[in-house]
Amino acid sequence: MAAKNKIVYICSNCGFESAKWAGKCPDCGEWNTMEESVKTAVSAKSAASGYSSSASTLLTRPLAISEIDTEDEHRYHTGLSELDRVLGGGLVKGSLVLISGDPGIGKSTILLQICEYLGQKLRILYVSGEESARQIKLRAGRLGVSSPNLRILAETDVQLVVEHIRTEKPDIVMIDSIQTMNFTDLNSSPGSVTQVRECTNAIMRCSKSLDIPAILVGHVNKDGAIAGPKVLEHIVDAVLYFEGDRQMTYRILRAVKNRYGSTNEIGVFDMGEAGLRQIENPSQAMLSGRPTNASGTCVTAVMEGTRPLLAEIQGLATTSGFGTPRRMSTGFDYARMALILAVLEKRAGFYFSNLDAYLNVVGGLRIDEPAVDLAVAMALVSSLTDTPIRDDTVVFGEIGLAGELRSVSHIESRVSEAYRLGFTRCVLPYHSMKSIDSKRFSGVELIGVHNVREAFDACVQ
């Protein structure tokens, strides 16, 4: 006897499933997120599951790890070295990659640019649920994409998409976007928790069985998280986030999950009329246009994975026009900024209690490593005292609650990047001096300091 469909309630935020409705999700605690959905019988979906009977048979026998052949493991280079860096060396066969970001950030653009390079030798199937084939052609023309092996499919029915993949057998599949795909057998609208989960599963199974890499575009919700169930991020092999303000040209591509590489790498791009242009020297780009002999600005060296990056920190302290002073931070943790302000008042005698304090990381970067603490403090104190930090100085170090400076990692990489871009002075924690070979950096004056007061004196002398 065929199984019957049943009504369930699924949280649109976390994907929690319940047999009855509730105002508050028992799992994530969000209110008014439980949505009614019809759970379709397994038999109704089996035709579009993405598995063939032969593929299932092959996967049923356990294999000894020594029997598994990995000699033919191959990565497709995308033509964008910055993207390859984030992916861990390129696209792995049979992998499922999710690219997410705000609307207009460049997700579809980067897919078409990948098509232009890979499409010279490989067959690519580009599936769009948001645009017609004509619209994609017009956008591709603007970007200069004219690959002979690129096939466009404007379709939202995932069952038909899987069928086309099995028929065409492309080398790479791109889905733009996963939230527009739907199962016609499911009684829920595209983009719902059930639809997103089942459509992703179908594409994943098809991709794995045919050993075809697939790139999915994912929308984000108002909080910046990927729209749909959290299980979506567990299904895919890699999750890449595009960061950056649409009003600015810089874009940061960051991996938050990667089964085939590091999650500490970033790729830096510049969005222009001709699409995304990769920036292979991001430090120089981030510091372009930096004001000279101006108070409230400080250069620091941060580590993004194995890549050292110079960034400009800007601080502003000004008289408050309200009873309660305002605090605002862009690109740096607000709570960490408040902690640094408290340390400056208590341990160094720089008072911000009656002043508004603003902090900005230039270029749209988001920095969360403790090594930036000292640069944040120096930028704010420089603005408070209206005393410029020397233009040839790079600052980094972690600040403790006693006002002391703690050592940070990758000292030599940070100093090397600063020296490469012409900086001749580095103010760093005194204890970090032991881990650096000063003979390698004869052209850089290394100044070890014990606390924030010493650091400020060293920065302005």
Locate predicted features.
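Conserved Walker A/P-loop ATP-binding site and its immediately adjacent core
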Residues: G129-Q135
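Conserved RecA-like ASCE P-loop NTPase motor core of nucleic-acid helicases/translocases
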Residues: I124-S128
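Peripheral, non-AAA+ core regions of ATP-driven protein-machinery
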Residues: A2-N13, E17-R85, V92-S100, I105-E116, ...
